[in-house]
Amino acid sequence: PAVRRTALRIADGRLAEVGDKVKLAYRQNVVSAVLAERASKPVVVVALGDSITEGATATRGSNGDWPALLSARLQQACPDQVVVVNAGISGNKVMDHGRSHSALARLDRDVIALPNVDRVILFEGINDIRHDGGTPPVAGRNAEDMVLGYRQIAERLHSNGIRPIAATITPFGGSDRYEPIAAAN
């Protein structure tokens, strides 16, 4: 997936700015997670989703993705008590592999394997119901398929002591990616 963070720390600890004459790369190899022990045990929330969760439409480097905004609000309300992990990947689907492994396939690696996860906000599905990109258009998943996928995720999370929270799929009628064949399902 594309890296949408450009923040870089320089020697004095502040965030790098363009004027610092530091080359800021927009696509780069990154460490996917850094785990640190702490004295208190915060509530760990994983945001599992697609490009909406990843922050594909946020201004690059702004931390304008919804998990970062949620994290900032929670830090204001209850400092150091909640950690939000962004596990969004552009193009991700609940059931089928797209640009990446499906949410079902990556659930163990990206959520369950993380230590002390308490809750998961699942914001996935718009890519499943859109057509598959073929010509002629082929319908994506239907409502029954989606419910089955969501149930499988919920059951796996519950069996690991993690509370799932489902977000509503956003409407997409009128967007440049709207497909009547997908909306009919």
Give the residues covered by each predicted segment.
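Alpha-helical cap/lid subdomain in secreted, periplasmic
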Residues: 61, 72, 76-80, 98-185
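Active-site metal-binding loops of divalent metal-dependent hydrolases
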Residues: 50-52, 89, 126
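Short hydrophobic segments within beta-strands
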Residues: 48-49, 87, 167
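N-terminal secretory targeting modules
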Residues: 1-48, 54-60, 79, 183
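Short connector loops at secondary-structure junctions
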Residues: 79-95
